[in-house]
């Protein structure tokens, strides 16, 4: 008889490392029981039909089992399949068990349970196969969804049952109980209740006929709950833009199928050997009702391209890594001369000799030996409607010149049907003219000849008058050297435009001819009812626009005094104020705002075609000087841009610019609770982006932590307190179809109801708000706490939420940075400020990822101290600072900090490393107490940003 050695079965997914009843620990190499037997060594279990990954819904206990079982991956209409496994290289009786495990590596026990024809009370399914057919098909499997409220107890029970089964005991030791408690806590953090996998384990009979010989288990593909937003396939439906600048920052509206706002990103990539990829910039608040994303394009990896470059973009889930089909996106080269000023300046300048031949006007000169006026003329586009400069002239040869540039042939060629009061001359072929003359009687011919002679006399008189005036102007110019003498005669020609639509005044501004500008303006103003001063070229630019673009301050002032209209917009909807701010020219902005016509509120708050007013552009350009000038001139610091209703403070928070946000709040008194069209305050944006520094500053300056946006969350528990938990499960699950705006699936909805109902009710009591059944709005909106995924931000918000356990009145703030002694900070500052390049405070700022503050503090008396205060405000600690100094090679600084009393007090070998705020990711999971700062460290973190701009004492949240 063959001897079979059995290693006792042990479940590796529940109790790794727990000792057996004999006191011997299980080696990790023996976690999967092995059957040692010559005939059984080659036996194995395999999945021949995977379960369908998407489209199957998990159900709650109260709903009963599903009407249809979990289908197979290849199942289709008319051909149903189900999950199927088979034992190979073995013939005989066997038992196959199926249970649920997590979608982690390695898989671990899952809280959900299986139901079906062969299921038991423990949530497993067991079937017996053999000896003829070793295939097991599971055609009636259902998955029971548990709530987070019951998740802990179910996991404990499953783990206890596995240990008792594997050890053969009836009770657990205290050590085992504690290990289970800790493992359940860890398991809850990584378990996704919307994803499960099937674990199939085959048991073969031993010598006693008991099914104890286990083959290595096999794990199925992940199965997604169809009610979860993460279960749907990613798909891009539409984009409003498929090309953008190589420098990035273009706003794109993308429509898609249902996504989760905190588990989605837009990835740009190149499918080549370089492997470049980047991600679109957006916050959870930029995801609209799970079906639209508004993001800004990332910059291309190189700015120097001479032709358009096509890349790909796709939607990607952060957790599972699922991606959508790729779409093409084109980066076009950077526009170096968007206003085309440099292109026009590079044109060949005219010379004196250009006007000897083929002059562009009757007085432009003629070739030697030719009569006056027979030189080739150009068609002049007279757009000025008030002009009346048409004239005729004759020559000895009988020809003449019309103001439109056409030559007259014979006066007798006039059309006999002409009935206009003002005579005109038509051009005909000579054959047609001869025929017309021969058919006209002598009386008509005499009349026409007289009429023609009269026209010629009038033309000669006009030409003579113009010649006399030009001659006198030339003599006067020779006497006075004043070019206006010559310009006055041809003042109506100042409306002439070239191929770009530029008038002489445009060209004078482009080429910086200040004296010519002055002379032209004076001549133009002498024309009654003229509009030449405000004429636009083909780019919709007036001379005033060009003066601002080319930064000619005196010219801009002169044009405004002359009556130039500052309200005219260019092709992008930019006023002169927009242009000055976009070029970061605060001096030009000051010149413009001195004139009442520019400082009018309707102009100073006028948006461009993108909906942005000058104050919004000042924030986007990070220019505090322009911002101050505009606000002092009457600009609305809380002005809402037209696309989404963001105020300048919203934009500063969106840019993660702490310095500018503090400046807006403390210096310019921006509304800290201003709302966008979607009801989001700046605090919503800061929290959703996971920024502890901005969040702390806003709440300390009075931001309303309890403010709700307009996006509904899961509804509150029913007013009927007698409603059972299972009933609420059904109600929440079925009602989720009616408020699909929420990003949570049905399980999350139930979990929120079970776990957070008391907290939500308490929050509403603090705001004197009744539950939704007594409110006009059926569902409550998201608060900043609801939007954040950062534990640090959540801690900051909870400290400033009235009524919360961690909330307390604001006390005195610590004076010392990182609780270090004053002399230690001073010595460290001296060491860094006197350090060489690469080992100074700017290098420290770069390594701490706070390089954006270098410009802010470089001219202050204590830049190092200011930098360290911001580092502390971001959640940094002393240990990380020491590690950073060590990486910079500043051993003296490391030694200085290690000798400090603060380091000696708090340092211990077992101290866990804290992750600083600027290293935190937006998707960080809830951290256990072992990963957070201890109480002594928390007390050293300041709760205010007052050190940044110490003017007034900040107020606590409402």
Swiss-Prot record:
Region (GRR): 352-390
Stretch list, region Disordered: 350-374, 411-442, 705-766, 904-958
Gene Ontology cellular component annotations, sorted alphabetically: cytoplasm; nucleus
PTM statement from Swiss-Prot or TrEMBL: While translation occurs, the particular unfolded structure after the GRR repeat promotes the generation of p52 making it an acceptable substrate for the proteasome. This process is known as cotranslational processing. The processed form is active and the unprocessed form acts as an inhibitor (I kappa B-like), being able to form cytosolic complexes with NF-kappa B, trapping it in the cytoplasm. Complete folding of the region downstream of the GRR repeat precludes processing.
Gene Ontology BP, a term: signal transduction
Short sequence motif named Nuclear localization signal, residue ranges: 343-347
Recorded domain comment: The C-terminus of p100 might be involved in cytoplasmic retention, inhibition of DNA-binding by p52 homodimers, and/or transcription activation. The glycine-rich region (GRR) appears to be a critical element in the generation of p52.
Name of the protein in its database record: Nuclear factor NF-kappa-B p100 subunit
Organism expressing this protein natively: Xenopus laevis
Gene name as annotated: nfkb2
